[in-house]
Curated annotation (Swiss-Prot):
Disulfide bonds: none
PANTHER family given in the database record: 15-HYDROXYPROSTAGLANDIN DEHYDROGENASE [NAD(+)], ALCOHOL DEHYDROGENASE-RELATED
Record-listed NAD(+) binding positions: 10-33
Protein name as annotated: Alcohol dehydrogenase 1
The EC number(s) this enzyme carries: 1.1.1.1
Organism this protein belongs to: Drosophila mettleri
Keywords of the record: NAD, Oxidoreductase
Reactions that this protein is recorded to catalyse: a primary alcohol + NAD(+) = an aldehyde + NADH + H(+); a secondary alcohol + NAD(+) = a ketone + NADH + H(+)
GO terms for MF: alcohol dehydrogenase (NAD+) activity
Length: 254
């Protein structure tokens, strides 16, 4: 997908990886970039507008833990204004295994709810035009960081959901792929809580190993958007972009 002249909704587009990705997206010249986030950042919004004044950038406050009905109401406002949306990026995430319910609500249920809400406008069975979803998951969904099992499980669930969305594309007209960053230098990973304090130094231990910058991750994210491969499971790690082959151990035969 060429980003130029497209309409894009980016949930959590002002976060660590999110903000650098928004910068890279704006450089590619979309028509509209609509950022949905919990907290407005006027300085960041102004910076994005300055990068490419031809791009219309709009911010709406949004908490992914609201109901599907509330999400649908906000999306209707956006669709009424833009008429069409080409790409939805679900990027909300937290890393704190003390907060079990909120981790699941943000990292998994929030992605499901926002996706469910946009189907009202995209699903071809309802006369919609289809669309593309990029879900930011994590390499911990492949192999867990066992000291943060709640976070890792929430990301594994998000990957599984995304894989199912991709297989449903012939029915819904909506394609999907997952973006799975490795350990990236963001505020998220500098300090976080392990489950039941099984490893108080988990953040320090992770950062002793090779990481990547948010810019490297963002640049590869844009490459994945441009590749636009339905069902792709992208690994963005150590400055590289690699497609992962998912191993199938069971088949439902339906």
């Amino acid at each position: 997908m060429a980003i130029a002249n497209k309409n894009i909704i980016f949930v959590a587009g002002l976060g660590g990886i999110g903000l650098d990705t928004s910068r890279e997206i704006v450089k590619s010249g979309p028509k509209n970039l609509v950022i949905l986030d919990r907290v407005e950042n006027p300085t960041a919004i102004a910076e994005l507008k300055a990068i490419n004044p031809k791009v219309t950038i709009t911010f709406y406050p949004y908490d992914v833990t609201v109901s599907v009905a509330e999400s649908t109401k906000l999306l209707k406002t956006i669709f009424d204004k833009l008429k069409t949306v080409d790409l939805l990026i679900n990027g909300a995430g937290i890393l704190d295994d003390y907060q079990i319910e909120r981790t699941i609500a943000v990292n998994f249920a929030g992605t499901v709810n926002t996706t469910t809400a946009i189907m009202a406008f995209w699903d071809k069975r309802k006369g919609g035009p289809g669309g593309v979803i990029a879900n930011i998951c994590s390499v911990t969904g492949f192999n867990s960081i066992y000291q943060v099992p709640v976070y890792s499980a929430s990301k594994a669930a998000a990957i599984s959901f995304t894989n199912s969305l991709a297989k449903l594309a012939p029915i819904t007209g909506v394609t999907a792929y997952s973006i799975n960053p490795g350990i990236t230098k963001t505020p998220l990973v500098h300090k976080f809580n392990s489950w039941l304090d099984v490893e108080p130094r988990v953040a320090e231990l992770l950062l002793e190993h090779p990481t990547q910058t948010t810019l490297q991750c963002a640049q590869n994210f844009v490459k994945a958007i441009e590749a636009n491969k339905n069902g792709a499971i992208w690994k963005l790690d150590l400055g590289r972009l690699d497609a992962i082959e998912w191993t199938q151990h069971w088949d439902s035969h339906i």
